[in-house]
């Protein structure tokens, strides 16, 4: 899908800045560093992984989510296939590392990704399709479930709170 030029430049500059700092201070990257441009929801729930295996899993998992969240057909089965693990193993691993199951994580991730578009005043249906929801009505229901208000009524001066 097309990307806004300013957003792409901003992300590249941010990544370059971090790379320079990490190199200068000889800092190894952890999960939180890899999610610098992630939605607030992701930053809020990500644990500091105690071991390298969990850290690598989270980084790979987030890369897969970022690459596929806009596809409305993307689901746990497809994610587990891309991670080369069974659905059950993915469920066990996620329950160990995250407070939400896969479906809720993906839903909240998509909702967070929709916030800038909502703030710009784009139409609900357009936003819904852009972030992987099947319809504007379903997007609105999910938004209300998580934020306790419809997207059309959301005030951007408030801090974002999820359940």
Protein language model annotation of sequence segments:
Residues 1-2, 19, 68-73, 101-102, ...:
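Short helix/strand-capping hinge loops at secondary-structure junctions
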Residues 3-12, 16, 24:
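C-terminal output helix
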Residues 8, 12, 58, 65, ...:
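Heptad-repeat coiled-coil signal-transmission/dimerization helices
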Residues 19-60:
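CheY-like receiver
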Residues 20-26, 139, 161-163:
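C-terminal end segment of the histidine kinase catalytic
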Residues 49, 62-74, 94, 98, ...:
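Basic, amphipathic alpha-helical hairpins
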Residues 76-105, 130-153:
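Basic/polar phosphate-binding segments, predominantly the helix-turn-helix DNA-binding elements
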Residues 96-134, 156-163:
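Terminal helix-turn-helix DNA-binding modules in bacterial transcription factors
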